[in-house]
Amino acid sequence: MVSKESCRNEIRAAIRQLSDRCLYSAAKWAGEQLVGIEQDSSNFTPSNTRFQRGSSSIRRRFSTNESISTPQPSVGFSQPPATPLPQEDEVIDGDLYLLAKSYFDCREYRRASHVLRDQMSKKSVFLRCYALYLAGEKRKEEEMVELEGPLGKSDAINRELVSLERELSALKRTGAIDSFGLYLYGVVLKEKGNESLARASLVESVNSYPWNWSAWSELQSLCTSIEILNSLNLNNHWMKEFFLGSAYQELRMHSESLAKYEYLQGIFSFSNYIQAQTAKAQYSLREFDQVEIMFEDLLRNDPYRVEDMDLYSNVLYAKEACAALSYLAHKVFLTDKYRPESCCIVGNYYSLKGQHEKAVMYFRRALKLNKKYLSAWTLMGHEYVEMKNTSAAIDAYRRAVDVNPCDYRAWYGLGQAYEMMGMPFYALHYFRKSIFFLPNDSRLWIAMAKCYQSEQLHMLEEAIKCYKRAVNCGDTEGIALNQLAKLHQKLGRNEEAAFYFEKDLERMDAEGLEGPNMFEALVFLATHLKTNKKFDEAEVYCTRLLDYSGPEKEKAKSLLRGIRMAQTGFPSMDMEHFPL
């Protein structure tokens, strides 16, 4: 693998080149990775280390000893140049380019494009086309506000895409396009729905210039399956490892994703990005305590960070940590209240307090700022479900599916909404879609099983199959075991029912739980064993029932009387005459 100093030099040059082309998101990402590289001890100075203060929970997690050794890569990297190769036309920026860049920075995109209309260098062509693309996006957003229908629906499109595709494809045919132009060409093709050509263009872009994270991100959005990901012909470079870590996470291959980030820790030991990505993977694995610790550590190192904090708010919401969520909402609101993430966090806070109308208002505000903000669409759908407004919930979930067809939460939400409407056939369709994207989640199998149990379907055998899958997927709440026992009991399969009641009882004993499910299991097992003349075993369960008060205790006494009578063959005396 390349050395830390080599990576550092590459990134420094890349930041300048990306910034020169107004690719500010990619430049910001590169800058964060630059300060995430651990400094050599000989170079430790206050200026070098001020972004690397404090311990990192992610670093502690991956460290096996005090000194961090660079892990050996699974594949060999071809040695890249010490810095990105400069284009021949970037040595001296022309006066017109400097003016156009100034207009671009002031968001005057059409002026920037017009200034460069006669400039033919690759750098100028890219900035002109990029400015034109953003001008079209800006106008599209304005039209969406002017013409929007329910929940912001609009048929507005970027009217510059056709001319941009024509020009960029011509440049590609003649070889007069660089890696940045290929990136923009891929974006345009993706917007027009030509995903196959878009992938090819983006692969060509990242292979010729691997430091543009925006190109990698666009490519990742087009990798909707592991088959597509594996088919990409990508050069070996350390940036590819960042891409694979993120792509694996989106494909819910969390172990593989974590392995990539562990590998990258060898050089980028202080990367806040890697820590946030690792927290996302742990969140998907429902390791909420670990995720909370990691986000707390992240905020200590980067206290004004808003990015990814919406995920942190989801963790606090799931843990019902109202005080911590209130603090986080207040903090991000003061930092940048017009960020979609900030609005989403405040929406989560109001949802936790049961103020669903206010929550919807903030999720709507988040969507005003970013129409493609997936979490806001899904969470707004959840709020409408809580408000029993199923039609609005369905609309919100459908918009989430439009943004990301691979998001299981939106499909699951649609299933829940149709189930509430008493339409189990529709609900089943959407639950199946959610399971396709997340087959190892017990909650989804349980939801589908309940559909099969509904009065309209009454397909109990199919429900049993789903509950068995839920058990195999690690149903921590024990819903599946209890339902399997009840279904087998209902179908007259008492041996199978006894098996699952016993398993459920073992689970409740291990977790120290009590309640109606335990009483139900004890009564069934005692009765079943008594019927099968296993009196000693039946007595054990009856004795446990005597620890209850009220009707449970009376039921136990009745069972014990029956057991004694069956054992002796004589009518039993009152229980008070027997020592218990």
Please state what every model-predicted region is:
Residues R173, V206-N207, Y263-G266, D297-R300, ...:
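Conserved structural position within tetratricopeptide repeats
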Residues C22, R107, G136, G193, ...:
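Residue-level detector of the short coil/turn that links helix A to helix B
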Residues I92, S121-K123, D178, N212, ...:
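Residue-level recognition of tetratricopeptide repeat
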Residues F104, Y133, K190, Q249, ...:
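Position-specific recognition of the canonical hydrophobic site in helix A of tetratricopeptide repeat
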Residues D95, S124, G181, A215, ...:
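TPR alpha-solenoid repeat register
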